[in-house]
């Protein structure tokens, strides 16, 4: 079992775990930005002539090349989907760090295949195979890293860390855009091979971190390895394995694990329509990932440089610069989410995001209806406004919301379904965007604008506010809505924050299974978010 900490403990160990996680998510964003810059690179299309758009293409030629471009780009998402599925079925058995090491290793193999593919015979096929293999590795990592980091971190900073991981996706995109721009003057295939190969550096850092850092205490407890769990907890906290602090956290994890086991479910449990509303809550959790993709984020990220050049008719050099500026704005715009996610709340941020993104794309499509130089500038403004709103709203929210909205017994299934929804919708959007943009440069933005407004309506009626709520309170909200015949968001608005005693009382009145002995032990151990934070802050000061 991997309990090694490489001599690190306390703050240094926690920072090392965070660093490895951050690099892993940066790699996710790096690939998005890399392909955005490569697709219109001279040497890239010379190496893969099938991707080169002729000067005066016929409608058939343009359609064919758009299909190939979409397939070459979106095949990565298909690999990610299967990697996430593998993690869902094998993750608990293999462990967090083992799975991350496997994912990083597979990603390295895929990056090598893509980097060294030779031209002249089936070159696109080689490139696609490499991207699919890389995607499998990335899918394994993106499904596992947040769990590993969350289980190794304190209760009070988990929401912040999810936002930080989202910011690092944008950070990876930022790095990729400027790397591609910086090497765009190279006169041979190094112009595209170097950015592709640079993925290997990120993956090596992640793989090294997985080898040198411990698995999560929660995973050890789930496998019955209590001594190892206490050993790792002691290292993370910077104290001895038998200290009061370690025993407190160990008992907390043990209690939560027993609660989860007592609520074990299968897929049949998901299709529950009574007071607990499992199926409705599963769909709501998945809807965030659906709307994240179908409101246009990856259409803008993957194809921004191409859109600047082909749809907005900018010169190639200027389109590369605009792509870099676009990525810089994207990265910087994630910063407000760190402060707003708790203060503003999930529901309001969702609505702000849908409205802002929709209006941004309205500006873009309206400016593209009649193509002029001035209108192109207005269209570019719309794209920049879109990515600004997206960065602090729909980038982090779909990753935070599913674990909060789903009940305990379907939380694992709900999180897995949400992740798979993301990758499948990602694949679909990245595949059809170049086809749609080729047929109607303004129509594609109208399409995404309409989906944003659909999301605004859906979010208003179906998203309840979970910020500051205990997970048991969300169960009460849906049960009260079912009993009283009200919309859950109205119940959540009218229901004040409940104390532990009020949660138990209302759960009994509503006929919910409260698992009293588990809840009492949670209270004793300080498992609620507020008390856990207070306890951890006390220990941090010692």
UniProtKB/Swiss-Prot annotation:
Signal peptide stretch: none
Keywords per UniProt: Membrane, Transmembrane, Transmembrane helix, Transport
One MF term in the entry's GO annotations: carbohydrate:proton symporter activity
Induction cue: Expression is induced upon voriconazole treatment. Expression is up-regulated by exposure to human monocyte-derived immature dendritic cells. Expression is also up-regulated in conidia exposed to human neutrophils.
Chief subcellular location: membrane
SUPFAM superfamilies named among the record's database cross-references: MFS general substrate transporter (SSF103473)
Keyword Membrane found: yes
Family statement drawn from the similarity comment of this UniProt entry: Belongs to the major facilitator superfamily. Sugar transporter (TC 2.A.1.1) family.
Name this protein carries in UniProt: Major facilitator superfamily transporter mfsA
Species of provenance: Aspergillus fumigatus (strain ATCC MYA-4609 / CBS 101355 / FGSC A1100 / Af293) (Neosartorya fumigata)
Encoding gene per record: mfsA
